[in-house]
């Protein structure tokens, strides 16, 4: 079952008359569209992409199962035409409540009459369980990042700036098929290595520094994300101790992970391991969750 079929089955289960999709992530996942200006209207049995003249050819090539409509001036007139064509004169239409701006929602309400109601649908839930073909793309994105990092390690040296290291890493990912970095690449060395989101700077990497990298590749719309920490030159006894504590906590988490285990419980397993080694107070007190997805 592809993305469109999964969405249409969900509309039937929820007894919705249709769904409006506007976010780039969901347009990519459910329609295959990678342009910047479009929205989709999907019912149980039909699917339309509404876009302007710049993307009609692209949408025709990318959006299998969708009818492509080019709007001229008012995008909502095209939606009304679709509703009239399929005799949808009322009911409940799903929208992306988390992604639709208030002004867009108000325009939508003004365009459709009082016979329509709107309900917010979290499409991320439909994307959460990955199909086999999605897993292939995710593994490819991870492999690209991993291979690029291995090359970086052969070039990384004291005297290089964090930004120079970032450029090498991102270039190696691009040469291996990544379309862009997953996010702003983090390279944090020395005193900056304690920053969870220490985006690369002009700081010079020095001998003896911890250097933390947080980076990822994008392949087929799927993002990888990995964090690696290295030492420039021989590690001190304290660096070895800290590295080993974090590594053991990670391995405990890997060993414990299984279907049905909550992220909170998994976090506690790793956190407790670090606390047992005397560094519980140094652990950042926040919860962080990321869903692997098509898009960003």
Question: Locations of the language-model features?
Answer:
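Active-site neighborhoods and metal-handling regions in enzymes and metal-associated proteins
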Residues: 1-296
């Amino acid at each position: 079952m592809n993305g469109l079929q999964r969405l249409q089955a969900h509309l039937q289960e929820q007894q919705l008359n249709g769904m409006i999709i506007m976010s780039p992530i969901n347009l990519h996942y459910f329609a295959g569209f990678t342009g910047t200006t479009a929205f989709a209207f999907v019912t149980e049995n039909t699917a339309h992409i509404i876009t302007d003249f710049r993307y009609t050819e692209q949408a025709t090539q990318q959006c299998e199962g969708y009818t492509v409509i080019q709007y001229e001036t008012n995008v909502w007139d095209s939606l009304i035409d679709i509703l009239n064509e399929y005799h949808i004169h009322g009911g409940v239409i799903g929208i992306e409540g988390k992604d639709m701006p208030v002004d867009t929602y108000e325009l939508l309400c003004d365009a459709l009459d009082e016979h329509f109601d709107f309900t917010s649908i979290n499409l991320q839930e439909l994307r959460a369980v990955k199909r086999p073909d999605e897993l292939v793309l995710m593994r490819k994105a991870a492999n690209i990042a991993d291979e690029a990092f291995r090359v970086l390690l052969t070039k990384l040296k004291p005297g290089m700036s964090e930004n120079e290291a970032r450029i090498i890493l991102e270039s190696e990912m691009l040469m291996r098929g990544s379309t862009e970095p997953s996010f702003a690449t983090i390279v944090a060395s020395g005193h900056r290595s304690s920053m969870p989101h220490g985006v690369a700077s002009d700081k010079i990497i020095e001998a003896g520094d911890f250097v933390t990298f947080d980076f990822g590749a994008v392949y087929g719309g799927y993002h990888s994300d990995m964090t690696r920490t290295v030492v420039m030159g021989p590690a001190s006894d304290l660096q070895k101790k800290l590295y080993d504590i974090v590594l053991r906590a990670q391995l405990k988490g890997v060993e414990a992970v299984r279907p049905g285990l909550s992220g909170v419980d998994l976090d506690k397993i790793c956190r407790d391991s670090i606390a047992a080694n005397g560094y519980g107070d140094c652990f950042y007190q926040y919860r962080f969750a990321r869903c692997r997805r098509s898009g960003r």
